[in-house]
Design a protein with these regions (language model features):
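PAS-family sensory domains
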Residues: 24-25, 88-94, 107
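Short hydrophobic secondary-structure edge segments in sensory/regulatory modules of signaling proteins
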Residues: 17-23, 142
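PAS-associated C-terminal cap
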Residues: 1-7, 120-134
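Terminal output helix/cap of sensory domains in signal transduction proteins
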Residues: 64-86
Length: 142
């Protein structure tokens, strides 16, 4: 099994992931649609999510992460038509989650460039990595 196939199989085992379809308008990434998995991960119904975010992806991103993520996504989409990034999002209950996002351009029937993204909650993995780093940092001579 290739690494890519293993990662895809692993994604299907995860419960906290979803898809988002968006596009750029006036330098803002706007949400066109989200699936049920994305809404469940964020704690919203679809209508609540659209109202809360005003249809803007940036309104769901944790503000300290927003500018860097925005820059990286635009840069990578321009260079290769796809991107991968990690950042934090705020859920309906106010808690933060770490997400891994992989997106790419795809054209719709009208020729408009849309961005299809897979967004996965990687909070557990992020917590484990941070705890490991803290442990290593506290080892004498480490």
């Amino acid at each position: 099994m290739t690494k890519e196939m293993w990662q895809l199989a692993r994604m299907h085992e995860l419960k906290d992931f979803g898809e988002r379809l968006s596009h750029y308008e006036n330098d803002e990434m706007l949400i066109d649609e989200v699936d049920e998995g994305f809404c469940n991960m964020m704690g919203y119904t679809q209508s609540e999510l659209m109202i809360r975010s005003c249809g803007k992806v940036g309104d769901l991103v944790y503000p300290p992460d927003y500018e860097e993520i925005r820059y990286q996504i635009r840069k990578n989409l321009k260079q290769s038509g796809s991107y991968t990034c990690r950042y934090r999002m705020r859920k309906k209950d106010g808690s933060l989650i770490w997400v891994w996002e992989n997106g790419r351009y795809e054209k719709d029937d009208t020729g408009r460039k849309n961005i299809r993204s897979l967004v996965v909650d990687v909070s557990r993995e992020e917590k484990t990595m941070r705890e490991r780093d803290t442990t290593y940092d506290n080892i004498p001579g480490g």
